[in-house]
Amino acid sequence: MALALIHPSKRAYSLAPLNLKEELQGFKVQGDRKGVGQEPLCKQFRQLRYEESTGPREVLRRLRELCRQWLRPETHSKEQILELLVLEQFLTILPRDLQVQVLEHHPETGEELVGILEDLQLDRGKAGEQKDSAQRSRPTVLVGEPAPRREAREQPGCALPQKPEERGKETRSENGNLIAGTDSCGRMESSCTMTEPIEAQCEDLSLKKNPAMPKEKTNSQCLETKERLVQNSGLIEHDRAHTGEMSWESVGSQSSVAADHQEISKDKGHPCQECGKVFQRSSHLIRHQKIHLGEKPYQCKECGKVFSQNAGLLEHLRIHTGEKPYLCIHCGKNFRRSSHLNRHQKIHSQDEPRECKECGKTFSRALLLTHHQRVHGRSKRHHCNECGKAFSLTSDLIRHHRIHTGEKPFKCNVCQKAFRLNSHLDQHVRIHNEEKPYKCSECNEAFRQKSGLFQHQRHHHKSKLA
């Protein structure tokens, strides 16, 4: 039976949820897979060996099992399985360095993978152009020649002091002035009248060669402001203020900044036609366009909530599974999102709690205090249609609605008990894990909930609390 194919341009928006992140992790370099336990199913299917099984029937059964676990035909359509196979083979034939760079962006469709590769090729081309331009702009230096002599070679009218063995014949007039001379190779060197800036540069070069020689103070006068300067080199720098001339150092630095700015503006070359937002990579633009199209192909099988990106679905599934992969190294507490862990870690770095000036309530983080202060400064504009109760935040109204609807989206994986709030599920899971994080500082008795610790302290340590 032939597979029904769809156009590649539409496939990126019409595919149902594919949990590609799990499959794509199998293509990472072995050096990046430290600490990973089980091999991905696609690699187990590809690398199964006949010698590892007891017989041909066992090999066939194992291959069918691995293929079904990998492709999941009971949940995926033919188009989805085809897309998964094409994407897997595409990643397999990529060079190793490109595999690593592509997997950092977590492509979800073949179109996104192509967009990522095109962006990488564009970046490599720009890097090569920058390297070539840097080599072309680098000044040519004569090897084996001292720096002062190279500077003098660039100034034809400036002659360096010659060594005795290098001096040729010199022709002088009757009054002793040098008319022409020959160098050690026999070439004629004609005299010329040097301008004042070149004389100043020759003077600086002679001082570099003979640092012990005292430098005479010469009074130079600016023709514009009649200001007198001690050295001719100072007059050169002073004249640039009137003429607007820039030294080669400042010109080079400003041109490099302008070039960097142009490169940045070139990178942002993928604008959204709907809202005008610009993206550096075409793959990012493809993901962003799903917002305007209203496409939410990734649906949660537990509660039916839909998402525009597969990453959002994977993050949402942690609510139902109870998975909290982000661990705080200070207190051992786990979190579902990395942003929650970052906010939590600020508790350990702060010594003093933050207090609300309106009601005196204290908070461990400034963000919680800001969130709480909205209660005092904002009117309760969100009313419940069932009981008329008002709330200042829409999130509080949504949580309150679950009381009337009876919705309990947070389910325990062990006993299947459902809860209205995620915090209630966290407290319930401690029963199965036998976790008691709240410990009495007086007698070291532990409790699962903070309220149990408070009741214990009021009854058994009432005198010490007073």
Curated annotation (Swiss-Prot):
A zinc finger (C2H2-type) spans 220-242, 270-292, 298-320, 326-348, 354-376, 382-404, 410-432, 438-460. Residues 42-124 form the SCAN box domain. PROSITE patterns: SCAN_BOX (PS50804), ZINC_FINGER_C2H2_1 (PS00028), ZINC_FINGER_C2H2_2 (PS50157). One of its GO terms (molecular function) is zinc ion binding. InterPro entries: SCAN_dom, SCAN_sf, Znf_C2H2_sf, Znf_C2H2_type. It is found in: Nucleus. There is a cross-link at residue 21 (Glycyl lysine isopeptide (Lys-Gly) (interchain with G-Cter in SUMO2)). Gene3D superfamilies: Classic Zinc Finger, DNA breaking-rejoining enzymes. Residues 124-135, 163-173 have a biased composition (Basic and acidic residues). Its main location: nucleus. Residues 124-182 are annotated as: Disordered. Pfam families: SCAN, zf-C2H2. One of its GO terms (cellular component) is nucleoplasm. Keywords: Isopeptide bond, Metal-binding, Nucleus, Repeat, Transcription, Transcription regulation, Ubl conjugation, Zinc, Zinc-finger. May be involved in transcriptional regulation. This is Zinc finger and SCAN domain-containing protein 26. It comes from Mus musculus. The gene is Zscan26.
